[in-house]
Amino acid sequence: MNDTSLTAHRDNSGDGIFSYRIGSGKYYVVNMPSLVQQVFAQRGNVLNKQRTLEWFMKTAFDDKFSTRDEHEAFHGHHNALNLMLKEDFINEATGKTACAVEVEAAKLVTEAPWLYPDAEGKPMELWEEAGQVRFNHDGTFEANFYDLIVNYMGQIVIDMLWGKALIKNHPNLQADMWHFDEGVHHIITKFLANITAAGRRAVAARERLTIAMHEWHEAVATKQAGRDPGAQWGALDDISQVMQDRVKVWIATKASETLQKTNDVSVLWGVNVNSNKNVFWMLMQIYSRSHLLSDIREEIAPYVHISPCGERGPDGFPKLNINIDGLMKHCPLIKAAFYETMRMNMSGLGIREVIKDVVLKESASDAELFGKKRPQAYTIPAGSTLVLANGTMQMDQRIFANPEQFYPERFIEEGPDGAPRVTMKNLHTFGGGLYKCKGRYFAEKEVLIFASSLLVMWDVAPVNGEELEVPKMGYAGASRSPLEDVRVRLTRRYN
């Protein structure tokens, strides 16, 4: 099933649900908003995705069925991740992220190596190397924008959650993570894993990632037991509480090494794969529209700005002040731009196994929207599979008018107090019900912090030509990657 075939079958059926038979199984594809909400409302004894999750962990991460067989340990790990939904974690994580970005935003690109007197010059940051930064004599910089952004953002977020020693000891961690992401759909197809170059790179990268995450786990577990993990790991005192707790869960439940390292790789990938890419696509859409760029900069100016007292970071670059609360509450346009980016960029399928027969009924408004005379009810039998066709719904002109157009205002409406407010409406990129994304609240603040800070600190233009063009989307991992990276010229707005 892909977006093209799903769109064709949706349009041909005219219904809120249509079905496929693949082998011995029957798959019911949901493509109407009111039906999606009913799916989210079902309990786990009616609809769940446990078998799908077990299959994915076995196929994508080679967990050798440990997710299936070590039930207590696996669910203990997921319960520990629930901390990411709690206000204390969100405030801690976003506060630490904002503090880092206030200093690091000006360091998206640093300074040319030849400006330093030592013979070997100043080494590039890892994200600069990934973005193949070129330092121009006129004070501007050139870089591959996608690789620069996803690795810059990944460095800060990984350091904040897992501590700085992880990447310090495994400097190729992000390169491996993005190689895995590029080829994960080849791995899932199985026979492509060893045939295609992307598949082979992904398998090799996955192996290195599991080694890195197990070494990190062993070091933290050793520290928690009151022993010295070794000088290369340092104090390990900058690790977030949620990751500290997960190590304790693995120890308490006597989880196997395979379960620990494969699930830790899945969390590392999951934390980065959507947010980092969305910041890239969001920045590309905004920088390529001068009026939108101007409006967003004006909107965020009171809440994200250069330090009024001229503070500078330890490297001498200008420091930002970021008011997270003001950014979230009083900047509807940039938040709507984030939602619109997800609508156009994230194309995934939500899977639910049907444990008991379930009846789903179209709403009258949705039936009218789809041109039907009356709502239809569907009985979905136990033993079948429900598929939520998020990607095709997000590009359905009946649900989102002019879906090919980047139009953030579609998510802005007037609130009860007359002020504009942003609502996701029929956008379900964070899932819902039992399977709502655990990192949703942090992810939204994280994306706005990174995007707003870079919009304030940097001008971005094409290396060739007058207008920045948004690249075409390919497929990789959970969110789309560009088919080709885009080479840009960056200029720091404040020195």
Which stretches of residues belong to each language-model region?
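Cytochrome P450 heme-binding "Cys pocket" and the immediately downstream C-terminal segment
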Residues: 292, 423, 440-478
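Conserved cytochrome P450 K-helix E-x-x-R motif and the immediately C-terminal K′/meander segment
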Residues: 1-7, 306-376
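Classical protein tyrosine phosphatase
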Residues: 275-298
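Cytochrome P450 heme-thiolate monooxygenase catalytic core
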Residues: 99-279
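Conserved cytochrome P450 K-helix/beta-meander segment immediately N-terminal to the heme-binding cysteine loop
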Residues: 382, 388-418
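N-terminal membrane-proximal hinge/A-helix region immediately C-terminal to the signal-anchor transmembrane segment
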Residues: 1-80
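Hydrophobic, well-ordered secondary-structure elements that form the walls
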Residues: 341, 383, 406, 433, ...
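C-terminal helix/juxtamembrane-tail motif
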Residues: 478-495
